[in-house]
Amino acid sequence: MKFYQSLKIKKKIIVIFWHNRLLMTSFCWNYENNFRMLISSHRDGQIISNAVSHLGIGTIQGSSSKNKMSSLKEILKSLKDSNVVGITPDGPRGPREKIKDGIISLIRKTDATVIPLSYSAKFKIQINSWDKFIFVTPFNKFVAVWGNAVEYNKNKKPEENLKVIENELKRVTKLSENLAK
């Protein structure tokens, strides 16, 4: 599996997942590399940060709109130290399931491999928020799908690279939805 091979050879890895599916992402992580999530410093981000810390996942405070340089430095340091960094490329404010172009700048700066992750469940609750945040109910069929590793292609335009990444994340999201039925 390309993802597992990337971990074994200590490549820089950024795992991306939609903002509405970040809650259960921590349960999908089962590798020896440390995992750190970029999480908003807002109150709701702090709740998530506290929850994932109990599962052994570190956090990087920041977002695409605040503390950009501080969080970028922390991401660069984490990747250099062989941590895997998790990012919601449509967060913290959307639009829902639309990747912002900041991820392209990040992978160009870091030369990281991007690996999409999505999940779904047979029974779930979607709350009425900008992202239609998903809560998975207990005692349920849960499916997580890891996508193909995507590397930045220097022969393509940045927006073409972004489309490749977004399409792969959408593919694994749709696949997880279908498998969870």
Predicted regions and their residues:
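Non-catalytic C-terminal accessory region of glycerolipid acyltransferases
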Residues: N30-N33, S70-K181
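A short acidic, often aromatic-flanked loop/helix-cap motif at beta-alpha or helix-coil junctions
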Residues: K2-Q5, G45, K66-M69, V150-K156
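Membrane-anchoring hydrophobic helices of lipid-metabolizing enzymes
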Residues: M1-M24, C28, I57, K141, ...
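Catalytic core of membrane glycerolipid acyltransferases/transacylases, capturing the structured
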Residues: K12-K66, T110, Q126
